[in-house]
Structures are given as structure tokens and as C-alpha cells.
């Protein structure tokens, strides 16, 4: 990612002289939406809403975005994709771009982008739904995997997208009481945001040690999110410190506690593995282009008992990383690996959908495969896997062949040569 943005800075600094940058700006339009670049809507039978939930007044609390089945309320507005300018600043820090420049660029290109989920729309009650906890990648945050989360919600899942506070997110925050707040002020008006930005490696610091420590915290945050949603479903009242019109009481008896899974991308893929090893209530897991460096030796030794699906891109993986995956999955028919042909590491987050061909290819946000086809393969394989291992009574088994790596633009296992090197 760092080398990618070295290239980015060179391009932007030469923007007045470069026909490429002028064309890229025209291609993207104002906010990306004017040229029809949109995050895809869910293809399932259910309308989707989303809302944010934060508990506690310290970094140890929980913060997540819940995607859920909603009543079909056409009057409700779609949700801003990136909700605060501080996320632009965090992305700039992560990508080694001056904050002032990065904030302006992100605001120009994606500032008006929305995700196709209705903000705080009324929850659709009536049955118990399976729950999926989602973990974001390094430098990401809770909102930028909305294409995957919305599709899962449209197919009947509750999806809790965690925002991690281990300093691996580009930016996140917690709410603390204002120093000058009055005792009679309500829960939301008497608080202010305390921002936590991405922490870079310090000089001489070993990355594996830092990432292993972070993945432990990330797994605990996924388990906290699970506990929080189950607490709400049990009817216990939870205080949301964010100002929201959403009525959490409507989620009472909404979770099928026997059908819970965990899913994540990159660093979030490692988080999936750690979460499975620590929490048996996660019945299965899906790791998207997992980055295995953070996974501890103890996890390999104790192994992961639950079913696990690795969905990899063609261009990101390397032999040592794949061999670590195979160490977890060897001789277990409930652990699968597939690779999406023509895909790149950024084929899973939303950035691939809000960039045009020039920006997308130059910054490796797009692969050779159409982004919509890549995400469909990912989502369909995931749904088929979840149906089997959560014992769902749906029709997702029509995509079972994808889990075995059979179909257009998908292969079983990996494209990486694993032959021993001399």
C-alpha cells in the first residue's frame, strides 16, 4: 500500500502538467457518483438498513455498524459512505500523504458517495436471523466493505461490522464526556469524539510482534460485538452513546444464536482465524485474502476446529502466506481454499467500485476481472459455505460448485507455485 501511494503522490503533484490526472478527474466526476460509479446494492430479497452502535465512554467499549433487514422505506436516505473528515485524515496518514492534500482529494473523489443501505431505517422483525461479524483490514474501518455487508444483509443476515481500536484502522474514535459538560446534559450532547489514528511501525520495531498483539485485541473486539448483539437480542437495554433515531428494542429475539459466523479481509482474515480459535459460538469463518503474519504459533498448535473458507485474490498472495493457510486447513474437508482469477487485494473493499478504469487500474483498486463479477463470486461462495455450515434452509446451495473452485473465473486452491525452492 505504501508503494502504491508513493506513485499516487507523484501523480497528484504533477496534476496540472499531466493529461492522465486531468482525464482521471474527469472520469471520476465530483464524488465519483456523476459517472455512475456506485457501490452495488444487495441482490437478495430484503431491503437493507444500517446504523451505528457505540457503547462505553472509553476505547475499551464496542463500536460497530449493523447492517440489517429493513422495512422497505423509500423515504429514508442512503447512508454516507465515509461519515467524517477525520477518516480522510487517517487514510492520508496511513498512505503517507499530507493530511491537507489527502483530505481534499478524498473529499473531491468520494465525498458524495453513499452506500445503498438506508440510514436508521426501521428494522424488519418477525423471525430469528443468522449473525455475521465482520472484521476490516489494515488501514480500513467499519464502512468500506459495505458491498459485502449489504449483500449478506439482503440475503437474510444481520451483519455487525466492527471498527477496531487497536490502532490498525486508518481512524476511529470513542466518545468521552466533555470536560465542561453539565451533570444534567443528556447522554449524547455531553460527549465529544476522541480520535485514534493508525499507528505506524516505530524504528527497529518488529512488525510480527505488533500485529500479533493487535490481532489478539481484534479478536476480543469481535467477541465483544457478538456479546453486545446477543445482549440486545435477549431484551437487555443497551445505551448507545451515539445520537441515533434507531430503536434497538426492535431487535429483541432477532438473532438465531445457533447460526453465528465471522468474516474478514486481509488483517481481518487473520482476525477471523484468531476469533475462531477463541470463541466456539462462531460456527464457521470466511477469510478474504487473509494476511497470515499476525496469526500466532499457538493458534497453529491448537488448530481451528470450525469450518473455514479462504477466498483469495490472484495477485496478492505469495507462497509463505499460502503455506500458513494450508497448515491450518490440511486434511480437513471442512476447510476450503479458492482463488478468484483476475482479482487483486482491493477487489474486496468498496474502493474498487467508486473508481473508474484509469484510477482503478493505476492504483491497483481493480483487477482484470470486472469488480462486480469478482464480488459476486466472493459473495455467492460465502453464502453457499454459510448455508452448509450454519444449516440454513435457503437456496444458496446453487453456488456450492464455487466453494469447490468450479466455475468461471474461480479455481480450487491457489495459483501460487508452492514447489520447494532450492
From Swiss-Prot:
SUPFAM superfamilies according to UniProt: alpha/beta-Hydrolases (SSF53474)
Family, per entry: Belongs to the AB hydrolase superfamily. Lipase family.
GO cellular component: extracellular region
Compartments (UniProt record): Secreted, Extracellular space
GO biological process: lipid catabolic process
InterPro entries cross-referenced by the UniProt entry: AB_hydrolase_fold (IPR029058), PAF_acetylhydro_eukaryote (IPR016715)
Gene3D superfamilies xref list: alpha/beta hydrolase
Entry's EC annotation: 3.1.1.47
Catalytic residues (positions): 266 (nucleophile), 289 (charge relay system), 345 (charge relay system)
Keyword Nucleotide-binding: no
Gene Ontology MF, one: 1-alkyl-2-acetylglycerophosphocholine esterase activity
Pfam families: PAF-AH_p_II (PF03403)
Alphabetic keyword roster: Glycoprotein, Hydrolase, Lipid degradation, Lipid metabolism, Secreted, Signal
Signal sequence coordinates: 1-21
Keyword Signal among record annotations: yes
Enzyme superclass (EC): hydrolase
Main location: secreted
Gene: PLA2G7
Function per UniProt: Modulates the action of platelet-activating factor (PAF) by hydrolyzing the sn-2 ester bond to yield the biologically inactive lyso-PAF. Has a specificity for substrates with a short residue at the sn-2 position. It is inactive against long-chain phospholipids.
Glycosylation sites: 331
Catalytic reactions of this protein: a 1-O-alkyl-2-acetyl-sn-glycero-3-phosphocholine + H2O = a 1-O-alkyl-sn-glycero-3-phosphocholine + acetate + H(+)
Tissue expr: Plasma.
Family annotation (PANTHER family): PLATELET-ACTIVATING FACTOR ACETYLHYDROLASE
Name listed for the protein in its UniProt record: Platelet-activating factor acetylhydrolase
